[in-house]
């Protein structure tokens, strides 16, 4: 609906952790038990949960530390569990990015800390987000306001870094580094819509919440500006087929709806459709109507699921 600098190279910060999580569920089930392990030279850096080598937990618990609490050490542990080596895991991340079509992305770590040659773009983050949204196990974790873990010996509550979760933003991930600024991928399911927003380089204010304010502004503008536009009501005449004996009117059996700008007229006049814009074939049950331009200069293509054929030919 709205984009700005969507192909510009940016630092992904902890949004990187979404790719890390995808690779974990590619290799393990969430109920599997794993043992934490770190490289010998590993030093805790940034936000960490102080996981220790030898600790045992489920994959789900590890994903909670990665996606909810955003712990960097949990990402390093994940890379060791999946690949046995951090650099090999990074190769898997980049291979997965290529497979998904994230052509303006290169990962150089699994946690998102600023690093040379560690970059992505908003469009690539959109691709990554859509892939995460397909995984119900990851979404179930991402949507939790908090989780409890006893890795420190006693039960401790770890809060979700997503401060909009109580406002129906189920996620997907927050981030913050010096290069990325404040960044957030939000998915809001209010008003019978699923709207995904991605903000990057929000100014780091004292409360470190400008990315949430920017997200709410984007969401509000999208709700105010866009809607489902009804192009044809149900049972409205679509096309008339005539020959020397019979005149048959084709009606649509469902409304034709296009999501678009509520301030732009989207109604299409079908009386301009001619024979080279509608295909009739007696041996096929589905046909395309292609209307080159609507009033707002957009190209629409409509696909019939059922199309009646009455003693007509392509020259009629």
Model-derived segments and spans:
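Active-site-adjacent loops and short helices of periplasmic peptidoglycan-processing enzymes
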Residues: 1-126, 130-136
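Domain-terminus/edge residues, biased toward the C-terminal soluble/receptor-binding domains
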Residues: 102-103, 117-119, 123-316
């Amino acid at each position: 609906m709205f984009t700005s600098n969507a192909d510009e190279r940016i630092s992904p910060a902890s949004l990187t952790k979404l790719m890390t999580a995808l690779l974990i569920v590619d290799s393990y089930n969430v109920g599997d038990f794993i043992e934490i392990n770190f490289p010998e030279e590993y030093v805790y850096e940034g936000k960490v949960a102080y996981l220790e080598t030898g600790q045992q937990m489920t994959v789900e618990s590890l994903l909670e530390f990665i996606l909810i609490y955003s712990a960097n050490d949990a990402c390093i542990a994940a890379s060791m569990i999946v690949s046995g080596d951090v650099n090999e895991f990074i190769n898997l991340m980049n291979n997965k990015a290529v497979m998904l079509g994230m052509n303006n992305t290169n990962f150089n770590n699994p946690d998102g800390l600023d690093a040379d040659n560690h970059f992505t773009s908003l469009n690539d983050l959109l691709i990554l987000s859509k892939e995460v949204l397909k995984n119900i196990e990851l979404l179930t974790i991402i949507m939790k306001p908090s989780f409890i873990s006893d890795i420190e010996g006693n039960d401790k509550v770890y809060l979700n870094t997503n401060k909009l979760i109580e406002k129906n933003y189920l996620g997907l991930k927050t981030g913050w580094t010096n290069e990325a600024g404040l960044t957030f991928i939000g998915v809001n399911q209010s008003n019978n819509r699923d709207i995904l927003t991605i903000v990057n380089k929000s100014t780091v204010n004292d409360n470190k919440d400008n990315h949430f304010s920017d997200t709410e502004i984007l969401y509000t503008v999208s709700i105010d500006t866009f809607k489902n536009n009804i192009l044809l009501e149900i049972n409205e005449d679509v096309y008339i087929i005539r020959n020397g004996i019979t005149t048959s009117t084709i009606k649509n059996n469902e409304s034709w709806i296009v999501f678009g700008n509520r301030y732009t007229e989207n109604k299409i006049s079908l009386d301009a459709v001619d024979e080279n814009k509608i295909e009739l074939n007696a041996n096929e049950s589905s046909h395309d109507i292609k209307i080159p331009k609507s009033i707002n200069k957009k190209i629409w293509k409509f696909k019939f699921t059922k199309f009646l054929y009455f003693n007509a030919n392509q020259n009629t």
